[in-house]
Amino acid sequence: MRKMLSFSALATLGIAHAAYAATSKYGLQDPESPIAREIYSLHNLILWICIAIFVLVFGTMFFAIIKHRKSVGHKAAHFHENTTVEVVWTIVPFVILMGMAYPATKTIISMKDTSNPDLTIKATGYQWKWGYEYIKGEGSLAGVSDGISLYSSLATPMEQIYDKNVPKSENYLLEVDTEMVVPIKKKVRILTTANDVIHAFWVPAFGVKQDAIPGFIRDTWFTVENPGVYRGQIGRAHV
């Protein structure tokens, strides 16, 4: 454990084994990793493009309905084709799609690039906890999996869950008894698997969500930029 505590700055991570526990809000959580920042920017870009398309399409439609209605004397034009219009409504959507596809593809490629990590941790989903093994980097022994290992279980008092009269804590269903600790400004690779059913390793602030499937090893990665306590949860509705 002394090896872990030798980090100059740490980020602790608690993954609660409870679905849909996070407080709802209109936007994404503030990004705390490069990938999360890319996802956040991409989300905002596509949102504003969709809003612009919505305003343009419905604005044009309602303008035509109101200003060119039959009751004010307008008569519908009869025509079979308009080459200019057809070219425009083919090119414009293509340009818009390419404008969204390029940054989206770039972000997806970055999300999948788990090469050259500074630290590798195996995360195993159980009913009802997570197990962590530090396989490579700080916390491991000679780069093998006999380094630090721990189990992280939900720490929310049972009376808060089952008794409606008991007030919920600030981190209701997002608190664990033992946190996973990682260094900041280091690339952390997470290997996910499961012992029983499909789980999902989800940390919104890091832009990370990866299914943990029994019998399979899948991976994802993140780099924490600032020290702090970051909370995640199971992104599955089976609990």
Regions found by a protein language model. Name each.
Residues 22-45, 65-236:
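Non-transmembrane, membrane-proximal soluble domains of secreted or membrane proteins
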